[in-house]
UniProtKB/Swiss-Prot annotation:
Keyword Repeat attached: yes
Homology family: Belongs to the TRAFAC class TrmE-Era-EngA-EngB-Septin-like GTPase superfamily. EngA (Der) GTPase family.
Residues of the EngA-type G domain: 3-168, 177-352
Coiled-coil residues: none
Protein name (database record): GTPase Der
Domain of life of the organism encoding this protein: Bacteria
Span of domain KH-like: 353-436
Annotated binding of GTP 2, by residue: 183-190, 230-234, 295-298
């Protein structure tokens, strides 16, 4: 197992900047506004040939208020999970009460873990000297660094490396199914993840957009490992201000790129909106498996026909995406929670299904007998055979006399029949017609 390093400290001391410096990429949201990184974010990094996991956290800020209290809880959870702790402070602000309180907790409750006090923003020799004043926290070796320009960071990482186990062990086969939980803000994505895991992994509140960054969490069900990515939601472009919310939206789209199956969450109470359809389309265009999860179903007044009518209305709006399965759930009551995960697993299996050429050509023979293709020009379309092309999603090649003779309705007929015959529910199918 790769060692887990946690970055902890009060808000705005530069944790996200150091996180990005160590990983050499803009993996966490960085903004001068205190409290921007409000949850835990984990990514993999490496130094001097050794691999590790790095965790960025919300700031330690023991104040009243919904977000600040939740951030404190998340910081404590991060410290408990970590193998190594980087306690980050700000030399320009000096030693604060919050620094002393966090230092007291670290020394009292986590003395069994390697803890490194890094005093950030020491961009000049004078500031580096002033970092020595942080011995008052009880940590006798403060490291003067600048996450902004990188000074001192390499030396800090070299020292941290000495606490690593001698070997990372044999490489593990990662058979986890990657699921991205996406949707408009405040539809219940974090509540869904928390209900599923039975742990307050995400900060959850009624304030839209509480989960600003993408958080990866692993869990196992029926001996199958999953990686859940809970995102901040894809905002309407016109509602995204320059800065944090815009970047969060981009991160959500990146989460789609990383996943195999996108679980698109809808809020049952207002019904489907244009932004919901746009999110579904983004996932389908990226050739990901898609599952629609209609959340807050417990809030809808219903009878025996309500779910059927709702699904029919939903599919009428989806057009060509009606192949996507729909599940009604409630993160609050946990209705159909595990059914959703089991269905996502089936979709992942459908997406990676390999079908033999002989089975495909038997299918083609039956399909052509049922619906011989017609053309506008009067010329005959002759399809000789078909095969599956190697790809992360189902791609089928049809070899014919003239690809330009293939009409849209016949293409759609073949796609529907392929789904029906080979159980390809929830996945995008690509058909390619090639001349031969």
């Amino acid at each position: 197992m790769k060692p887990l390093i946690a970055l902890v400290g009060r808000p705005n001391v530069g944790k996200s900047t150091l996180f990005n410096r160590i990983l050499r990429e803009k993996a966490a949201i960085v903004d001068p506004t205190p409290g921007v990184t409000r949850d835990r974010h984990i990514a993999e990094g490496h130094w001097q040939g050794r691999e590790f996991r790095l965790m960025d956290t919300g700031g330690y800020a023991p104040e009243d208020g919904v977000i600040s209290t939740a951030m404190l809880e998340q910081t404590m959870m991060a410290i408990q999970d970590a193998d190594i702790i980087i306690f980050l402070a700000d030399v320009r602000s000096g030693v604060s009460y919050d620094d002393l309180e966090l230092a007291k907790i670290l020394k009292r409750d986590f003395s069994d873990k390697p803890i490194f006090l890094a005093v950030n923003k020491a961009e000049s020799p004078q500031l580096a000297i002033e970092a020595a004043s942080f011995v008052s926290t009880g940590f006798t070796e403060p490291w003067a660094i600048s996450a902004r320009d990188g000074s001192g960071v390499a030396d800090l990482l070299d020292e941290i490396l000495l606490t690593f186990p001698e070997s990372d062990g044999p490489p593990e086969e990662d058979g986890a199914i990657r699921l991205a939980v996406i949707g408009r803000p405040n539809v219940g994505k974090s509540s869904f993840v928390n209900a599923l895991l039975g742990s307050n992994r995400q900060i959850v509140s009624s304030i839209p957009g509480t989960t600003r960054d993408a958080i990866d969490t692993r869990f196992t069900r029926k001996q199958q490992e999953f990686m859940l990515i809970d995102t901040a939601g894809l905002r309407k472009r016109t509602k995204i201000s320059a800065g944090i919310e815009y970047y969060s939206s981009l991160r959500s789209e990146r989460a789609i790129e990383r996943c195999e199956v996108a679980i698109v969450m809808l809020d049952a109470t207002p019904g489907i909106e244009k932004q919901d359809l746009k999110i579904i389309n983004i996932a389908a265009e990226r050739k990901r498996g898609v599952l629609l999860l209609v959340n807050k179903w417990d809030l809808v007044e219903k009878d025996s026909k309500t779910s059927k009518q709702y699904e029919e209305s939903l599919r009428s709006h989806m057009g060509n995406l009606s192949y996507i399965p729909v599940i009604f759930t409630s993160a609050l009551t946990k209705k159909n929670l595990y059914r959703a995960i089991d269905t996502a697993k089936e979709i992942s299996q459908n997406r990676s299904r390999k079908i033999s050429t002989s089975a495909l050509n038997r299918f083609l023979e039956e399909a052509l007998a049922a619906n011989h293709p017609s053309t506008r020009t009067g010329k005959e379309l002759k399809i000789k055979y078909m095969t599956q092309i190697e790809a992360p999603w189902p791609v089928f090649a049809f070899f014919c006399n003239n690809p330009e003779l293939v009409q849209t309705n016949f293409r759609k007929f073949l796609e529907n029949k392929l789904r029906e015959k080979f159980s390809l529910e929830g996945v995008t199918i690509s058909l390619r017609f090639m001349q031969k």
